[in-house]
Amino acid sequence: MIGEWNNGTGRRKSSVARVFIKKGTGKITINDRDIQVFFGRETSIMICRQPLFLTNHVETFDIMVNVHGGGESGQAGAVRHGITRALIDYDATLKPALSQAGFVTRDAREVERKKVGFRSARRRKQFSKR
């Protein structure tokens, strides 16, 4: 399996996606389900396919993804990051275009932790003057 497949690992928020690509017809499978079934929102599907549209490889590769953790938005971002890394593993000349679009850089934004004495990360308890 390793010989014919190129792989990449993508991360976003608390989601991790392991992506495997090989020459094929453009079928994307996420956790043994079609991408249309796995992601309900069209926006998430578009986010996943962005690197393929940018490099004109929409119907060139069959993509198999294992993703876990986080929610729909984080998983879509993790899949996009993983597909980008797998494309670079397949053809390193694609890296400048993908990097220019900002797909190579891992989005480092994480949820800020809740602080003691606050209701959430930054929201304080209501102040009562009297």
Swiss-Prot record:
Q: Supply the InterPro entries for this chain.
A: Ribosomal_Su5_D2-typ_SF, Ribosomal_uS9, Ribosomal_uS9_bac/plastid, Ribosomal_uS9_CS, Ribsml_uS5_D2-typ_fold_subgr
Name one molecular function that GO assigns to this entry.
structural constituent of ribosome
Looking at the UniProt record for this protein, which Gene Ontology cellular component terms does it annotate, in alphabetical order? cytosolic small ribosomal subunit
Gene Ontology annotations of biological process type: translation
Keywords assigned:
Ribonucleoprotein, Ribosomal protein
Note the superkingdom of the native organism: Bacteria
| A Pfam family matched in the record | Ribosomal_S9
Protein family according to the UniProt entry: Belongs to the universal ribosomal protein uS9 family.
Protein name per its UniProtKB record: Small ribosomal subunit protein uS9
Give the source species. Polaromonas sp. (strain JS666 / ATCC BAA-500)
Gene coding for it: rpsI
